[in-house]
Swiss-Prot record:
Belongs to the cytochrome P450 family. Cytochrome P450 monooxygenase; part of the ATM2 gene cluster that mediates the biosynthesis of aflatrem, a tremorgenic mycotoxin with acute neurotoxic effects. Synthesis of geranylgeranyl diphosphate (GGPP) by AtmG (a GGPP synthase) precedes condensation of GGPP with indole 3-glycerol phosphate, followed by epoxidation and cyclization by AtmM (a FAD-dependent monooxygenase) and AtmC (a prenyltransferase) to produce paspaline. AtmB is also essential for paspaline production, but its exact role has not been identified yet. Its cofactor is heme. Heme binds at residue 457. This is Cytochrome P450 monooxygenase AtmP. CDD domains: CYP503A1-like. GO terms for biological process: secondary metabolic process. It is found in: Membrane. The chain crosses the membrane at residues 21-41. Pathway: Secondary metabolite biosynthesis. Induction: The onset of expression occurs at 60-hour-old stationary cultures and the steady-state levels correlates with the onset of aflatrem biosynthesis at 108 hours. InterPro entries: Cyt_P450, Cyt_P450_E_grp-IV, Cyt_P450_sf.
Length: 519
C-alpha cells in the first residue's frame, strides 16, 4: 500500500521537495524523448503569421520548449504586430490561434457544435490528468437556474459563515502585529463560504471537507503547472508519475466514497421514504441531484466529482487569487485604501447585516477589483474555443476543424485604443461609467477575463459576492503591511500565459482600533 492510499483521509498535498524532484526528472525525460521521438504536436493549418521569441530560422521545438517561460513576452509581441488580425503561437502541445477581438460579435453566440468552450477548457487545463469532466453541462445549468437567481437569499448564509471563518482563520492581533500568509487565509475563507452554499451546514465546517476541497485545488494547479510545458504526446508517460496527479485520484475517491457519495445516497433514500417531516436541503449538491437528466449525470460518484471540481476550480482558487492581488495592490498603493473603507462603512455600518444590495452598492470596490484584474489578469489569453467544424469568418479567414482559438485579453486591457493611460493604476477608473459596465463581473470585447458570450464564467456572480464580502470586512477591520524584507509589490508568478500572485508572501496584520469587531 503506497503512502497516499494509507493516508487517504488526510488528503495530503505533495511537498515542494517531492514536486521539485519530480520536475527535474520530468525535464530530463522530456528533453531525451523530444530528441528521439518525432513530435506529433497538433499543428494548425491556418494561414496566419507565426510569432516566436527566437529567430524564425531556429528549430521550431525551441519556441515550443520555451513557451511557458516566455509566453507573456511572445503574446504581447504578437498583439503589437498583428492586433487587428490573427496570429499563431507555438505551444508545447500544439498551435493556438490568437484572434483579434474584432471577431467577437460573430463568434460569441455560436453553438457548442461549432465552437466548443468546454473542450478548450479541458485541453487548456490538461483535463485528463486533472480529473476535469467535460461530458455534461449539469453544473452550468445548476449555476444558471438555481445558484445565480438565489444569490439574494444566500447572502445571509455567506455572511454568517464568513463571520465564523474570520473568527477561526484570523489570529488574535489586537494591539500587536501578527504574521499571516494571506493567500492561505483567503483560500480557507473562500472555501468555507463556498461550502456553506455548495454542500450545506452539515459539511461546511468539517475539516475533512475543507481540506479535501482546498488540497484538491492545489493539486489541480500543481499538475497543470507541471504538465503544460510538456508536449501532450508525453503526458501518458509523465502524468502518472506526478505526486500531485496521484493525489488528485486519491482525493477524488475519498470524496466520492467517504464524503459526498454516501450523503447523496442518504438524501435520495430520505426523499423516497415519503417521510412528511423531510425537507430537501437547499444547497448546490441537492440542486445537482434534482436537475440531473440521466443515470450518468445522477450517479453519486459523478455528482461528487463534478461538485468538487467546480468548487476547487471556479470558486476557491480564483477568488482567493483575486483577493490576494487586491491586498498586494493596496499595500503598495495605500492612497486608495481610505476611500474604499469609507464606502464600505457607509454602505455596511454593520457588516454582519450585509445584504445583496449593500454589496452591489460598493462601486469603488467593484472598480478597484476590475482595475486590479486588468493589471493582474488570470491569464494573458481568454475566450478559448475549439473549432468543431470548418469555419469561415466574415473576412474570409478559414479556421479548420480542430483549431484552438483564443483572444489576447491581457494586451487588450493595456491597449490605449480601449483604455486611457493604461499603464497607470487608477482604482476608481470605472466608478463614473455605466453602472452595469463598471461592475467587476461585467464582460465585453475589451474585458474578457471572465470569458464572453453564452459561455462566459457562469459562477462569477456568486464568486464576486463572496470575495467582496471577504475583502470588505478585511479592509475595515485590519491594518496590514509587508515585512521589512519585502520591497514593493511581490512579483506575480507567470506560468505560461497564466498569472497568479506570489502565494508564499507573508503579511503583517493588526486589528484596527475602533474597528467594528472591537467596538
Amino acid at each position: 500500500m503506497d503512502k497516499l492510499t494509507a493516508t487517504l483521509a488526510k488528503v495530503n498535498y505533495p511537498s515542494e521537495v517531492e514536486n521539485g524532484s519530480m520536475l527535474l526528472v520530468v525535464t530530463l525525460v522530456i528533453l531525451f524523448l523530444w530528441f528521439i521521438i518525432p513530435s506529433p504536436v497538433k499543428r494548425s493549418n491556418v494561414s496566419v503569421p507565426t510569432v516566436t521569441l527566437f529567430n524564425p530560422y531556429l528549430p521550431e521545438f525551441l519556441s515550443r520548449v520555451w513557451f511557458n517561460s516566455t509566453a507573456a513576452t511572445v503574446i504581447y509581441k504578437g498583439y503589437r504586430q498583428h492586433k487587428d488580425r490573427a496570429f499563431r503561437l507555438l505551444k508545447p502541445d500544439g498551435d493556438i490561434i490568437v484572434l483579434s477581438n474584432k471577431y467577437v460579435e460573430e463568434l460569441r453566440q455560436l453553438p457548442l457544435t461549432t465552437l466548443n468552450a468546454l473542450e478548450a477548457v479541458f485541453e487548456d487545463h490538461v483535463g485528463k490528468y486533472t480529473t476535469i469532466l467535460d461530458d455534461s453541462h449539469l453544473h452550468t445549468e445548476v449555476i444558471q437556474k438555481r445558484l445565480t437567481p438565489a444569490i439574494n437569499r444566500l447572502i445571509p448564509r455567506i455572511i454568517d459563515e464568513l463571520d465564523h471563518g474570520f473568527a477561526v482563520e484570523m489570529p488574535e492581533c489586537e494591539d500587536k502585529w501578527v504574521l499571516i500568509r494571506p493567500y492561505e487565509v483567503f483560500l480557507r475563507l473562500v472555501a468555507r463560504a463556498g461550502a456553506r452554499v455548495f454542500v450545506g451546514p452539515d459539511f461546511c465546517r468539517t475539516e475533512k471537507w475543507l481540506t479535501a476541497s482546498i488540497d484538491f485545488t492545489k493539486n489541480i494547479f500543481m499538475t497543470i503547472t507541471l504538465l503544460r510545458p510538456i508536449p501532450s504526446f508525453l503526458h501518458p508517460i509523465i502524468g502518472p508519475m506526478l505526486p500531485s496527479s496521484r493525489s488528485l485520484d486519491t482525493q477524488l475517491r475519498y470524496v466520492q466514497d467517504e464524503l459526498l457519495g454516501p450523503e447523496i445516497v442518504k438524501r435520495r433514500q430520505r426523499q423516497a421514504s415519503g417521510d412528511p417531516d423531510y425537507e430537501k436541503p437547499d444547497d448546490f449538491l441537492q440542486w445537482m441531484i434534482d436537475l440531473a437528466q440521466n443515470d450518468k449525470e445522477g450517479d453519486p460518484g459523478n455528482i461528487a466529482h463534478r461538485l468538487l471540481g467546480l468548487t476547487s476550480m471556479a470558486v476557491v482558487h480564483t477568488s482567493a487569487m483575486s483577493i490576494t492581488h487586491g491586498l498586494y495592490d493596496l499595500i503598495t498603493m495605500a492612497q486608495w485604501l481610505e476611500p474604499l473603507r469609507q464606502e464600505i462603512q457607509e454602505a455596511m455600518p454593520d457588516w454582519k447585516s450585509s445584504s445583496y444590495s449593500s454589496l452591489v452598492s460598493l462601486r469603488r470596490l467593484d472598480s478597484f477589483l476590475k482595475e486590479s484584474q486588468r493589471f493582474n489578469p488570470p491569464g494573458e489569453l481568454s475566450f478559448h474555443r475549439v473549432v468543431k467544424k470548418d469555419l469561415v469568418l466574415s473576412d474570409g479567414l478559414r479556421l479548420p476543424k480542430g483549431t484552438h482559438i483564443c483572444m489576447a485579453s491581457g494586451p487588450i486591457g493595456m491597449d490605449t485604443k480601449y483604455v486611457s493611460d493604461p499603464t497607470t493604476f487608477d482604482a476608481f477608473r470605472y466608478v463614473d461609467g455605466d453602472k452595469a459596465q463598471s461592475q467587476f463581473v461585467h464582460t465585453s470585447a475589451t474585458s474578457m477575463h471572465f470569458g464572453l458570450g453564452r459561455y462566459a464564467c457562469p459562477g462569477r456572480f456568486f464568486a464576486t459576492f463572496v470575495l467582496k464580502a471577504i475583502l470588505s470586512r478585511f479592509l475595515v477591520e485590519y491594518e496590514f503591511r509587508f515585512g521589512p524584507d519585502q520591497v514593493g509589490r511581490p512579483k506575480n508568478m507567470l506560468l505560461g500565459d497564466k498569472i497568479v500572485p506570489n502565494t508564499s508572501v507573508d503579511v503583517y496584520v493588526r486589528k484596527r482600533t475602533g474597528s467594528r469587531s472591537t467596538a
